[in-house]
Amino acid sequence: MLAVFEKAIGNPPEELKLPSMGLETMKSRQDIVEIVRSLWPDSTVYSLANGNYMASSQENESPSQPRSTVVTDDIFCIITGALENKTVLRRHYGLPRQATDAMVIVEAYKVLRDRAPYPSDQVIKDLEGKFAFILFDARSGTIIIARDREGCIELHWGITGDGSLVCCNDLNITGEACGKSCAPFPPGCIFMNGSGLKSFDHPLYKVRAIAREDDNGLICGVMFQVDLYTRLPSIPRTGSAANWAENAAVPGEENI
């Protein structure tokens, strides 16, 4: 699965640009499409507004890591892996037995977007299994990216030369598109383009970028992890208007 969004809508963490090597290898969004088509010849590319797009492929799919894609009501969702509590979630959201993992996630998003009074991380925490997914609501411009807490499903993200956000489960594509300006998407975390990156197991604590240096002292990569010593000023846990479609940044998280 792949998603590429321009800087204005993707709002990627600035720390992804820290690596000082490989900047010359960054590709344009159109270049990335050609890379995808060469590596995933059977891929389906979903063209979005302003040159943004998502893509899915069944290349190297396995029973342990199935893939599911759904497009409905201008909401695009691609998931790799499986929700172990899918039966419970189907029943909770009133979905038929045929509903796929991607359908379950979209329904959860729609219900929370329209009615929920509790934070998004609380809902992601209820998802059990080995999974990584990307969701985009074309009407609201909302992007949601999440990965299971064990990091069982491969997922990487990066930033291109023009500041576009790239997220993909294939390191070859992310690396070729972003050079050194890419990193593993942190396990147990959710990213929303309106509010940034947070841990759904430790939502009260900041997620920080940590730079890696080579033997010459140059930054060659970054990784993101929860800083259990830095507590966020406040996150409403109940009775809040915050939900998956929120666009207000949490104080203290603007630069994540």
List the model feature ranges, each with a label.
Residues 1-256:
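Cysteine-centered catalytic environments shared across enzyme families
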